[in-house]
């Protein structure tokens, strides 16, 4: 598990949206430092939203960013439920269609970047359209 730099818990002073935006920006920077290329953020389609869309080589990566102050109740990664996965898959399918693609024609994966306290966990290929 990677450590994130200590900056205090800024989420206490921010609105839920501001805190979410801050964690998504941190996730983007962290993923870019690992070699992924930014494509889009906060992509909304009917029925859902994708936090980040990145490119890892030729693979389109749909990223769900989660933050929890502590690991109590399972931590950040545990909050990506089957229902949330279904919404992400649906949203990605719609986004790909707008790009003239599909799961059959574009190499894709779904990652979860989980911030729990000061720890980062990167779950590559956390789920897929066959789950």
Swiss-Prot record:
GO terms for molecular function: nucleic acid binding. InterPro entries: Restrct_endonuc-II-like, tRNA_endonuc-like_dom_sf, UPF0102_YraN-like. Pfam families: UPF0102. Belongs to the UPF0102 family. This is UPF0102 protein YraN.
């Amino acid at each position: 598990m990677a450590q994130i730099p200590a900056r205090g818990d800024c989420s206490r002073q921010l609105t839920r949206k501001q805190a979410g935006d801050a964690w998504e920006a941190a996730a983007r920077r962290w993923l870019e430092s690992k070699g992924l290329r930014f494509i889009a953020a906060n992509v909304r389609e009917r029925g859902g939203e994708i936090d980040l869309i990145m490119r890892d080589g030729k693979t389109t990566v749909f990223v769900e960013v989660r933050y929890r102050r502590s690991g109590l109740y399972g931590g950040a990664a545990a909050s990506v439920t089957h229902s949330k996965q279904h919404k992400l898959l649906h949203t990605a399918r719609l986004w790909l269609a707008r790009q003239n693609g599909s799961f059959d024609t574009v190499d894709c994966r779904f990652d979860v970047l989980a911030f729990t306290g000061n720890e980062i966990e990167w779950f590559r290929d956390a789920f897929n359209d066959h789950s």
